[in-house]
Amino acid sequence: MIGQITSGLFGGHDDSKKVKGTVVMMNKNVLDFTDLAGSLTGKIFDVLGQKVSFQLISSVQGDPTNGLQGKHSNPAYLENSLFTLTPLTAGSETAFGVTFDWNEEFGVPGAFIIKNMHINEFFLKSLTLEDVPNHGKVHFVCNSWVYPSLNYKSDRIFFANQPYLPSETPELLRKYRENELLTLRGDGTGKREAWDRIYDYDIYNDLGNPDQGKENVRTTLGGSAEYPYPRRGRTGRPPTRTDPKSESRIPLILSLDIYVPRDERFGHLKMSDFLTYALKSIVQFILPELHALFDGTPNEFDSFEDVLRLYEGGIKLPQGPLFKALTAAIPLEMIRELLRTDGEGILRFPTPLVIKDSKTAWRTDEEFAREMLAGVNPVIISRLQEFPPKSKLDPEAYGNQNSTITAEHIEDKLDGLTVDEAMNNNKLFILNHHDVIIPYLRRINTTITKAYASRTLLFLQDNGSLKPLAIELSFPHPDGDQFGVTSKVYTPSDQGVESSIWQLAKAYVAVNDVGVHQLISHWLNTHAVIEPFVIATNRQLSVLHPIHKLLYPHFRDTMNINASARQLLVNAGGVLESTVFQSKFAMEMSAVVYKDWVFPDQALPADLVKRGVAVEDSSSPHGVRLLIEDYPYAVDGLEIWSAIKSWVTDYCSFYYGSDEEILKDNELQAWWKELREVGHGDKKNEPWWPEMETPQELIDSCTTIIWIASALHAAVNFGQYPYAGYLPNRPTVSRRFMPEPGTPEYEELKRNPDKAFLKTITAQLQTLLGVSLVEILSRHTTDEIYLGQRESPEWTKDKEPLAAFDRFGKKLTDIEKQIIQRNGDNILTNRSGPVNAPYTLLFPTSEGGLTGKGIPNSVSI
């Protein structure tokens, strides 16, 4: 029967022609961290002969025996390798020839089926048919792991790079399109295996490990009104023994094996795998080494010179058995990254940007304030719109939480203005870390942490810089939450012990800001909220769908890095809990904040207006006018935002010309419905969700998704080491309360203020762990793909979108030039500040490494 069908397909022998193609593949071991050294020898693929077959699928000639699906060509097999490519990774790609039988009736191939009869998987990059008669070149972008066929329940199929809306799909390809989506959705059951490609949702019930005792129990996030959360990728691991509602965890040594759909572990030597390996090494090997190093010695820095030795001299690690185990366990390629050593076991860190030019400028009030506009967390500051500041916490539960700052505290610093005049002139701003922290502060302070909730008021000076006016530090009333808070207000001083107290007050604010930054600005508002978009896009939008092609680069590695984070970073006892002041309450606290998350407000212009730092203004270039003109994050960000929106507008307008076309796109409607009702299901009834009924709603939504995944993440991630790599500037923990007069701590503060400061903030061991973490998080991989770039230049066949994408890239290049110009303008004092650190976090491109610039396409580290 099969012989008759293929004979009918290709006709007599005289009619058949040959179509030659090129297949690009990558060997499994190239990307295997456990055998990195061995893999670099680059063995030739053992895939020749009849071990890998390809069958083209016609988009114009049907197969009557196969339910109106396109006919298959005869199988074709890989021929001898043509050449070896050497990309930036340590491995290599190999190109093979493949020759297909073809005839006129077969027409244009729209897809192909691949079968792997080999024992190992391989990474398939692409298939290119160079000269299909009467059509020319046909290119298939694959970028997928192909396992032995026995591992799959259905054929592996890949489509040509011609996008189609569902209604425009060639009839003979529709069933293939639909079946591929069914495969990717799975049926919601079973434990996922390494070769699976299934995308599904789950709640965050895998952060704790109740089988290891009560101290390792963590609140389930998601699925409840009390602790709502974005969904994560489902792994299907069995429940824990002691709590059937908690998912079991995999052992630390298997951290690289945590499930994500196989193609979310891309075919490149990616930073997220490096991060996972590095974090595992820190937890498993470096921490015991550091404990051994500090055992029997005080876990304190005695002076700022002590701290500087981390960067200028290094710390000699003991040459004990654990150190030998460390060097034996980590591939040689990574030793220099984890331990910058000259072979003598010296733990040394690069000098962070914040102390590169001056060792003391970070302590100035101007720099303290400037980093709220141009530091690593420039997304919190807001305009003060009522005085004194009022709390939004429920007074029934928390009593009076309103601020105790009075006009007397600040009016002598307002350049002759009253408080009302300063507010009316848009001169007063606030960094408000009160309401988010107070509900947890009583519990947080039962740990080694001794922290406050803080409010910081600032004044916008005529030169465009901000001046701190007052810091209010509050902690829960000792008699109970219903009695409100105990607060004290501190004001700037540069004389005597009051100056030291003011420096400590700023440090308590920085501790708050670091914790809010890591858990909310960074983890929640980029990593966590984007994962449901990754899952829904793969489940509901075919790879043929134009919107899949638009968004796909902005999801690269996100599920992988988030899975690694659940395993090593944000889990019970993980690195983040060990470094931030919220400790074991950190993730639960982020769930409470998620209650206020609003998707349309993630658009940069909307965010700036909501925080009161901008007002809507149709005459301004981006539709908003900044009230702080020299606001580097906002100025550069609005340029990037507008470039993204122009690109998305051009792209979407090519495919959708009317509301009707949006409404009849069944894949698009299913995608948006699933995002609302499942991916962000705890917020499905919110009135602010776009209805997805117009091209403009699609444009706005896609622009916001791309902004979150690219520029917003870059702004809050890659400045971590430049600003927080020097822990005194951004301490993660406070261990003592503010010294009171008459106490030994107060006398120490008068006698040795630097030592008292260092005894208050992050301890020595935590500092080393924290600096190690932010250094890893702040690095770019050498094969990073930045905004305005694509992995494959042939990602679509449509010429108009390709031209629009080219315009997008050129616009980003222009923005780079503008950023350089602004950074060179001495009038814009907030661009570099007292520390002389030019603002480059939204500079679109970068080299690999620790650069403090570059906008990767996706949340990939």
UniProtKB/Swiss-Prot annotation:
PROSITE patterns in the cross-refs: LIPOXYGENASE_1, LIPOXYGENASE_2, LIPOXYGENASE_3, PLAT
GO biological process, one term: lipid oxidation
Keywords carried by this UniProt record: Cytoplasm, Dioxygenase, Fatty acid biosynthesis, Fatty acid metabolism, Iron, Lipid biosynthesis, Lipid metabolism, Metal-binding, Oxidoreductase, Oxylipin biosynthesis
EC number: 1.13.11.58
Known catalytic reactions: (9Z,12Z)-octadecadienoate + O2 = (9S)-hydroperoxy-(10E,12Z)-octadecadienoate
Superkingdom as given in the UniProt entry: Eukaryota
Subunit structure: Monomer.
Localization: Cytoplasm
Gene: LOX1.1
One Gene Ontology term of the molecular function aspect: metal ion binding
Domain PLAT: 29-160
Cofactor(s) needed for function: Fe cation
Protein name per the record: Linoleate 9S-lipoxygenase 1
Binding-site residues for Fe cation, renumbered to this chain: 522, 527, 713, 717, 861
Location of the region described as Disordered in the Swiss-Prot/TrEMBL record: 220-246
Similarity field: Belongs to the lipoxygenase family.
Pathway: Lipid metabolism; oxylipin biosynthesis
Function statement: Plant lipoxygenases may be involved in a number of diverse aspects of plant physiology including growth and development, pest resistance, and senescence or responses to wounding. Catalyzes the hydroperoxidation of lipids containing a cis,cis-1,4-pentadiene structure.
Single GO cellular component term: cytoplasm
Natural source organism: Solanum tuberosum (Potato)
Record flagged with keyword Lipid metabolism: yes
Comment on bound cofactor: Binds 1 Fe cation per subunit. Iron is tightly bound.
Domain called Lipoxygenase: residue spans: 163-861
SUPFAM superfamilies from the UniProt entry: Lipase/lipooxygenase domain (PLAT/LH2 domain), Lipoxigenase
